[in-house]
């Protein structure tokens, strides 16, 4: 796993994006087409992943990035998108899955046609991809989410989780790790009262947060491990006049969370750099399609400015530790991503 991002490293990713525009191609690829399939279009986190992917494609040279995804966060719509890409005979697919198992058949179909398939962010089950690129270590993400809200509410009170879809691979893994952290004695007075799902849709996430306020009048915190849900929950807190009574934490983008932090609805939240994630996923998918890497367990892939990515025995790799944002740094980072 790569070392923890510092302020300069995170900002450096964006500097590299600008600098890379005029850089000489690393490889003279011959019309390699890489499709980045996201959970749904119109989500800021994935738009930032796209920007990183475009940087990688430019750096490699001769690589076309096709950024696509469904309009709704369903496996059915993602399957249709992948089927379309198979028909287009793309060279590689990097997908963030809405359902770890439901995507396996269509991804296996793609691979049987010679398309190199990797998953990133939210993984496809191993039999449906070559490798999985995790944005960070799963255990660290889960622990971080619990630690942040615990610090804000002093380890005491009712807390709920507002997640994406019930089938989301990454959110479910993070929630499982949250519960492991929660079992520690220091959280004995901090009770998990509910887990609800907003399906990564802003309106539904907002309504789910409102429902939590009504169902749990003593609620003190909401953990939202989703960039859509955390913004919606924070807005619900502000609109309900609950700032200072209910706090929202989790995973979000600084550019989208600035208002919540300054308003006091959110004390701290975390995320990794989505530009780096999209850059690395595109770089790896393209290099595998070119035959420059295999993605096999135990191998290492040199992913441009992100350095060497080591593939673990389970054919997965992890990037940086989650980075914490609060009032002390939100202004700086909100200008970056």
Description of each model-found segment:
Residues 30, 166-170, 181-183, 284-337:
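Hinge/cleft segment of the Venus flytrap/periplasmic-binding protein
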Residues 100-140, 147-151, 158, 164, ...:
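Flexible loop/hinge segments that line or gate small-molecule binding clefts
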Residues 1-14:
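N-terminal secretory signal peptides and thylakoid transit peptides that target proteins
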Residues 33-60, 66-82, 90, 96-100, ...:
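Extracytoplasmic "Venus flytrap"
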Residues 59-70, 184-200:
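Short beta-strand elements in bilobed, periplasmic/extracellular small-molecule ligand-binding domains
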């Amino acid at each position: 796993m790569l070392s923890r991002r510092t302020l300069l490293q995170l900002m450096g990713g964006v500097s590299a994006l600008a600098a890379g525009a005029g850089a000489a191609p690393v490889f003279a690829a011959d019309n390699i087409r890489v499709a980045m399939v996201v959970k749904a279009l119109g989500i800021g986190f994935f738009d930032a992943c796209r920007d990183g992917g475009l940087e990688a494609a430019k750096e490699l040279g001769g690589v076309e990035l096709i950024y696509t995804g469904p309009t709704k966060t369903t496996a059915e719509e993602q399957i249709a998108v992948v089927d379309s890409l198979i028909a287009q005979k793309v060279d590689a697919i990097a997908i963030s899955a809405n359902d770890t198992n439901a995507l396996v058949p269509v991804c296996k179909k793609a691979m049987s046609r010679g398309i190199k398939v990797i998953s990133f962010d939210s993984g496809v089950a191993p039999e449906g991809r070559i490798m999985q690129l995790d944005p960070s270590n799963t255990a660290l993400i889960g622990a971080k989410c619990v630690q942040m809200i615990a610090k804000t509410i002093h380890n005491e009170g009712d807390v709920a989780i507002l997640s994406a879809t019930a089938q989301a691979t990454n959110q479910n893994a993070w929630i499982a790790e949250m519960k492991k952290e929660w079992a520690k004695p220091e959280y004995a007075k901090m009770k998990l009262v509910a887990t609800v799902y907003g399906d990564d849709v802003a309106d539904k996430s907002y309504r789910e947060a409102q429902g939590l306020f009504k169902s749990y009048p003593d609620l003190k915190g909401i953990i939202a491990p989703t960039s859509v849900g955390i913004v919606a929950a924070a807005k619900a807190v502000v609109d309900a006049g609950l700032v200072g009574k209910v706090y929202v934490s989790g995973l979000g983008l600084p550019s989208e969370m600035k208002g919540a932090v300054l308003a006091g609805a959110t004390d701290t939240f975390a995320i990794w750099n989505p530009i780096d994630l999209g850059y690395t996923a595109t770089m790896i998918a393209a290099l595998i399609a070119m035959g420059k890497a295999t993605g096999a367990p135990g191998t290492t892939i040199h992913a441009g400015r992100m350095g060497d990515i080591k593939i673990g025995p389970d054919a997965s790799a992890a990037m940086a530790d989650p980075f914490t944002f609060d009032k002390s740094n939100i202004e700086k980072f909100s200008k970056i991503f």
